[in-house]
């Protein structure tokens, strides 16, 4: 299974994930990125710097697999909290 690295880009700073996670596919990496962002926003609070940040998920070779904006994870959480009939 491939290894994915979850690097945080906050303004001009890139915080690299040196270890990564072995996951079955990019869909699972997307789910993990969303969960990481939500947890960070829950513990750190929502501020403008974080709302403009992204998680860059890369593969073993450093290629970007996906970019997940923090704001998108927050909006996604609001949609899930609504009652659906």
Predicted regions: what they are:
Residues 1, 24-28, 59-62:
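A short, structured loop/turn motif at beta-sheet edges
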Residues 1-16:
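Short aromatic-glycine-(Arg/Gly/Cys) micro-motifs in beta-strand/loop hairpins
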Residues 13, 46-47:
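Short glycine/serine/proline-enriched coil/turn segments at secondary-structure junctions
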Residues 15-24:
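A short, exposed loop/beta-hairpin motif centered on an aromatic-Gly-Thr core
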Residues 26-41, 45:
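A short, charged, amphipathic alpha-helix used as a generic interaction element across diverse proteins
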Residues 47-85:
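C-terminal structural segments of small proteins and small subunits
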């Amino acid at each position: 299974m491939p290894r994915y690295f979850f690097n945080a880009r906050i303004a001009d700073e890139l915080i690299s994930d040196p270890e990564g996670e072995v996951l079955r596919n990019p869909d699972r990496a997307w789910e993990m990125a969303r969960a990481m962002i939500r947890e960070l926003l829950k513990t750190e609070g929502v501020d403008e710097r974080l709302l403009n940040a992204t998680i860059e998920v890369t593969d073993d070779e450093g290629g970007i697999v996906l970019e997940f904006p923090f704001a998108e994870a927050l909006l996604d959480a609001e949609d899930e909290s609504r009652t659906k009939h």
